[in-house]
């Protein structure tokens, strides 16, 4: 699926996007994600990839000196602009996370939530994160997974997804914590924290630092 097709898939329901996400994975998991993000330290100058409607932008921005909230979808960006308003620390703009307009070593931190598992080439995305981060920069990833879920819970979540979104994109991945950590290491990151969060539904939460030798 091309970048344009991916954009079209996730852009179909901008006004109900958050409700659909909560229906599929549950409010409990979303609340746990917010709790983890609230524990993050200062993140400096940050870019958020796949900001969607800005649901996590609100949580991340207090941790930053300034931030870019970016997405490939015009319709989701429009919702994010309404949600965030004219926040003095936030610049909302359209970006392709696989090939951004940011200069090399321009930012202190990269944050993405529920993006890498729907990207056709996660390794390309991680390489772009590495490129734009300053030395010792921080990469924070949260992404849904079915690893560690009971079979019946997987089935029910799958049915909720199809009911909400239809057939998932063919390149959707369900990454394990070990696989994602390995991919990040291959891209030049040292893993600082990694865990699986959630009960009936799950998400990976992992923080990496750009290799000090970079």
Where is each model-derived feature located?
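Conserved class I S-adenosyl-L-methionine
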Residues: 1-41, 55, 59, 83, ...
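Short glycine-centered segments of the SAM/dcSAM-binding site in methyltransferase folds
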Residues: 45, 137-138
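Class I SAM-dependent methyltransferase SAM/SAH-binding core
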Residues: 47-99
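A conserved beta-strand element that flanks and buttresses the S-adenosyl-L-methionine
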Residues: 111
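Short catalytic micro-motifs in class I SAM-dependent methyltransferases
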Residues: 114-115
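A short glycine-rich, Lys/Arg-flanked "PGG" loop and its adjoining helix->strand segment in the class I
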Residues: 123-135
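C-terminal alpha-helical "lid/dimerization" subdomain adjacent to the S-adenosyl-L-methionine
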Residues: 142-187, 192-197
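Core SAM-dependent methyltransferase catalytic element
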Residues: 187-189, 193-214
